[in-house]
A protein has these predicted regions:
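Short loop/turn segments immediately following the C-termini of beta-strands
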Residues: 8-10, 49-51, 97-99, 107, ...
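A short beta-strand motif characteristic of beta-propeller blades
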Residues: 23-30, 68-74, 117-128, 167-173, ...
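Blade-loop segments of beta-propeller domains
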Residues: 27-89
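Beta-rich, blade/repeat-based domains predominating
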Residues: 31-41, 75-87, 123-143, 174-189, ...
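Short loop/turn segments immediately following beta-strands, especially the blade-tip
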Residues: 59-65, 104-114, 159-165, 205-211, ...
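Asp-box/WD-like beta-propeller blade repeats and closely related beta-sheet repeat scaffolds
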Residues: 68-138
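Loop-centered beta-sheet repeat module
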Residues: 146-200
Length: 328
């Protein structure tokens, strides 16, 4: 297993790392507070999360590691927490939780940034108590539509991607206070699964109609208290949805029915503190869980049924663990 892992913290320490499943480092670099990373082909991108500005950093594969090709700073935005890349348009997108901005830039063949832009998702609700907080970006398979989840406004925005910019074309309004954090499509994009940070649910939408089909809790039965649902994954065979809860400190496993609707099959306590991010390996055979507060990466092997194999989890330390990518 080859992983890329990022961890919060100042520049000067190795906080962007390529390693194996035991944490053995193959390559490392230092970037200021790399909150989220993504890859596309031979390219690697990292986003710097700072209260007062954001930075895109681009790399290209070089031997067993990566070589930095460029970085781009955006002023007047804050807390860049998620990035994604469109190969078709050679565009990198980022969601800024602190300021509510969508930021983007195009990339040339040498990995240099140009034609940068930013868009503020304005609070148009009339409720001044709401604060715009863009938190998630995702490009669809056709790479003609960008989805942006705004947890503060309880809106999922859809933008047309064209000519190095974006134009809004549609929205999903979730219920006030749900806070749609992250989303995942099924393979043919006929269903959209949305995990909500504050209501701690998975919402299931029929697409492209954007019709709500189901809402199901991610919390342990009878739980009362603070909880923030943080991550969602769909297995490659589309039979299992995984979600992680912070504060209530649990992982939850849902079986996906033939109709795409969910039923809970397992809830288990986490091994460390506050699972911030979670991915499935590309083969669907393991969960990789980033525990930011605990500073740990846990790898949880899964059985043929998509459920964790008892006693098989392994882990290694990683300071302020924020994000992981499976390189296959």
């Amino acid at each position: 297993m080859e992983l890329l892992i990022s961890g919060y913290g100042p520049a000067g320490r190795e906080n962007l790392v390529k390693c194996d499943e035991h944490g053995k480092v193959v390559w490392a670099d230092t970037v200021e507070s790399p909150s989220f990373i993504c890859t596309a082909g031979d390219r690697l991108f990292a986003g710097t999360e700072n209260d007062d500005y954001a930075v895109f950093t681009a790399y290209v594969k070089d031997g067993d590691g990566y070589r930095k090709t460029d970085s781009l700073r955006f002023d007047g935005v804050g807390c860049l927490c998620h990035v994604c890349y469109s190969e078709k348009h050679a565009m990198l997108f980022g969601a800024c939780w602190g300021s509510g901005h969508l930021i983007y830039a195009t990339l040339d063949k040498d990995g240099k940034f140009h034609h940068a832009g930013k868009l503020l998702q304005v609070n148009e609700t009339g409720d001044d108590s709401l604060i715009t907080r863009a938190h998630f970006v995702h490009v669809n398979q056709a790479e003609d539509t960008l989805m942006v989840n705004n947890v503060g406004l309880d809106i999922i925005y859809f933008y047309e991607i064209a000519d190095g910019t974006v134009r809004e074309k549609d929205r999903i309004y979730t219920e006030r206070g749900q806070h749609p954090r992250h989303s995942v499509y099924n393979h043919d994009e006929s269903l959209l699964y949305v995990v909500t940070e504050l209501s701690n649910e998975v919402l299931v939408y029929a697409m492209p109609e954007k019709k709500l089909l189901q809402r199901i809790s991610t919390l342990p039965e009878g739980f009362v208290g603070k909880s923030h649902c943080s991550a969602i994954c769909l297995s490659p065979d589309e039979k299992t949805i995984y979600a992680a809860n912070r504060y209530s400190e649990s992982l939850v496993y849902f079986r996906v029915g033939a109709d795409g609707l969910l039923s809970k099959v397992l809830q288990e306590p986490v091994e460390a503190e506050k699972p911030r991010h979670m991915i499935l390996t590309k083969d669907g055979r393991a969960l990789v869980v980033c525990y930011q507060v605990a500073g740990e990466i846990y790898i949880k092997p899964l059985g043929a049924d998509g459920l964790p194999i008892s006693g098989a989890a392994t882990h290694f330390p990683f300071a302020d663990a924020a994000c992981a990518v499976d390189l296959g």
